[in-house]
């Protein structure tokens, strides 16, 4: 056979081998990322990077390879399709709502339900009017805000809820349709700050406890892992500093959980706020044990809440992680939950409707 003809005949096979090899590599990359994300998580600094990075970026190799594979090799297209599915569903934490079942206990208290809205308002900027309009649209009974110092509260917020019970403490702002008062503050030594405030609310069905939470962001630790630092002579020091910040964050989370347990005393309790921690984090289950996450139980889709500003590689208005949560103890059924769609703050709000299934004490 003519050598040139033989070479031309082998060219398609070479391309096929290359595309298959790259497709397997892309699938392996996604699998390794998932193992790092869910198996390692914040137990190691590289897992923490995976936890707080925009996970959609992991799709890049498969998104490039898929259209090529569709023309050259269907098996390779299948591999890339599987990789895309794994990222879109598992890595990005897509949720389907679980069926709601009303309980016999709920009828004992007349099916008392309420709507709660929680959100970090970034000191009432950059577009609090949009955020406030979204709050109003949910028709809430309770509002729990973070990074909301009372001294900077806009007149529009005060006017909107002038006939409500308002409770403030450091950065926390709570509004209730029902009588409410502060029970205690959770001051943590890890960052020398208030990380939560507990409010007792007298509802028509009895008293309940709302804990408004704002724990430390991982961002300051991740700043230490800039490539210029990590791949320098000071790399080990940068990693050690990041791990120290992470350890203090986890200590703060544990302190807030101890605070919640002490305050609630088995009463009907809702814990809401900016946890700066996603459910996929290895630190989150230790905090949320015994509580149900409203979005996980009844939310639809991704529900990403942060960051909405231009602090990361994605454009403003495209959050990639869900770090704002509403948790309830066993006294409640979750009717529905959703996250906001506006970009009035650097976080989107979370709204949940919950129904009391045990008489409040």
PLM feature segments, named:
Residues 224-243:
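A solvent-exposed, charged loop/short amphipathic helix patch at secondary-structure junctions
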Residues 115, 163-165, 209, 292-293, ...:
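Conserved beta-strand segments of alpha/beta enzyme cores
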Residues 50, 115-121, 131-154, 176, ...:
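Active-site beta-strand/loop signature of hydrolases that rely on acidic residues for catalysis
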Residues 12-71, 78-81, 200, 258-270, ...:
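Metal-dependent phosphoester-hydrolase catalytic domains
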Residues 2-158, 358-361:
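N-terminal, active-site-proximal structural segment of metallo-dependent hydrolase catalytic domains
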Residues 89-109, 123, 127, 142, ...:
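Structured beta-strand-rich core segments of catalytic domains in phosphoester-bond hydrolases
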């Amino acid at each position: 056979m003519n050598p040139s003809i033989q070479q031309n005949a082998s060219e398609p096979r070479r391309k096929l081998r290359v595309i298959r090899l790259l497709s397997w590599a892309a699938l392996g990359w996604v699998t390794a990322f998932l193992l790092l994300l869910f198996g390692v998580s914040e137990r190691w600094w590289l897992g923490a990077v995976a936890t707080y990075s925009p996970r959609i970026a992991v799709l890049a190799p498969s998104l490039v390879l898929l259209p090529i594979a569709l023309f050259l090799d269907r098996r390779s297209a299948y591999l890339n399709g599987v990789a895309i599915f794994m990222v879109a569903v598992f890595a990005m934490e897509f949720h389907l709502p679980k069926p709601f079942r009303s309980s016999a206990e709920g009828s004992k208290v007349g099916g008392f339900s309420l709507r709660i809205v929680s959100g970090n308002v970034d000191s009432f900027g950059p577009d609090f009017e949009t955020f406030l309009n979204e709050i109003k649209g949910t028709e809430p009974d309770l509002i729990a805000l973070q990074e909301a110092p009372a001294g900077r509260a806009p007149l529009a917020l005060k006017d909107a809820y002038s006939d409500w019970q308002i409770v403030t403490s450091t950065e926390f702002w709570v509004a209730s349709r029902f009588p409410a008062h502060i029970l205690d503050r959770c001051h943590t030594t890890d960052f020398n700050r208030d990380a939560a405030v507990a409010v007792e609310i007298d509802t028509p069905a009895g008293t309940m406890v709302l804990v408004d939470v704002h724990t430390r962001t991982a961002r300051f630790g991740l700043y230490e892992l800039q490539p210029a630092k990590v791949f320098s002579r000071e790399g080990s020091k940068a990693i050690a500093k990041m791990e120290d910040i992470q350890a203090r964050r986890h200590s703060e989370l544990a302190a807030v959980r101890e605070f919640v347990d002490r305050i609630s005393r088995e009463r009907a309790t809702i814990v809401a706020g900016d946890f700066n921690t996603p459910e996929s984090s290895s630190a989150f289950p230790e905090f949320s044990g015994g509580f149900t996450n409203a979005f996980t139980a009844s939310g639809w889709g991704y529900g990403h809440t942060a960051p909405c500003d231009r602090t990361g590689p994605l454009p403003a208005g495209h959050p990639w992680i869900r770090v704002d949560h509403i948790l309830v103890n066993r006294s409640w059924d979750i009717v529905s939950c959703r996250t906001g769609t506006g970009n009035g703050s650097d976080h989107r709000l979370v709204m949940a409707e919950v129904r009391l299934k045990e008489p409040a004490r």
